Amino acid sequence: MRGYATAYGAATVLNAIANWKGSAFGISLRTSAEVVLDDSEGVRGDVEGIDTTLIVRCVESVLSHFDLDYGGVVRTRSEIPVASGLKSSSAAANAAVLATVDALGEEIDMIDAVRIGVEAALDAGVTVTGAFDDACASMLGGVVVTDNLKRCLLKRDELHSDVVLLIPEEQFFSRDVDVERCRALSRVADAVFEMAIEGDYAGAMTLNGLLYCTALRRSPEPIVLALRAGAAGATLSGTGPAYAALVDDISGDDVVEAWSSLGGRIIRAAVENRSARMGQADLFQEGI
């Protein structure tokens, strides 16, 4: 039995570490998963150079959800930089969950699939809050606002914008964050949450970026440069090191130019409003 799925990366509007409320939007960088199930002993991951604990746990969790006992192998291919703050773990988890469901020939509610991936991420130790907001953005597309403690989707909108991403050379894993330092700023995070609920996503992400740059001792300079170049909003994505800016055709070029002096990799993308897709083997078919 073989199944495929493709899910998307995401960028931050509000990081949920401070107050368990989160917001994020899908971006047009993809992760595809292939799951092959058989009667062998246990599930193994096969992704060169990447820890496969998370995706293996996702497959095992789906099998448990349907009360089935199979072994097999799970593989992923991705366009999303790892440990950058662009939700590579959420995309991998979502793709692995849906590919397993596809292999089984079953159906599953999208939010139930998200929750399976979130539990797997917590078990694998790759997240502080469960990253329910990131997982919803990756799975559902558009921009979402969530209560990560209750694992409840509060709001979803479509958001039509181009995105510029700055990915510094370093990597940073969410499990290494100073949680107490972030939670000391929860009152400001509450204000960002209200902005997101009211639909001011660009303003919310900018304030979020300034807040978390302070908490995580990261430079706000990319945010300031992006705003000066005409971006509608800019932020540190997740716990970094990546930054994201919402732009149009004109300001996108200007943000790229402004960021070009900072080093690192710059990617042009777009907000992804489509949901993750079961049965889609995009990156395997494209040979990426």
Swiss-Prot record:
GO aspect biological process, one term: chorismate biosynthetic process
Catalytic activity, reaction form: shikimate + ATP = 3-phosphoshikimate + ADP + H(+)
Pathway info: Metabolic intermediate biosynthesis; chorismate biosynthesis; chorismate from D-erythrose 4-phosphate and phosphoenolpyruvate: step 5/7
Location of the protein in the cell: Cytoplasm
GO CC, alphabetical: cytoplasm
GO MF terms held by the record: ATP binding; shikimate kinase activity
Name the record gives this protein: Shikimate kinase
Taxonomic source organism: Methanothrix thermoacetophila (strain DSM 6194 / JCM 14653 / NBRC 101360 / PT) (Methanosaeta thermophila)
Organism lineage: Archaea, Methanobacteriati, Methanobacteriota, Stenosarchaea group, Methanomicrobia
Designated gene of the protein: aroK
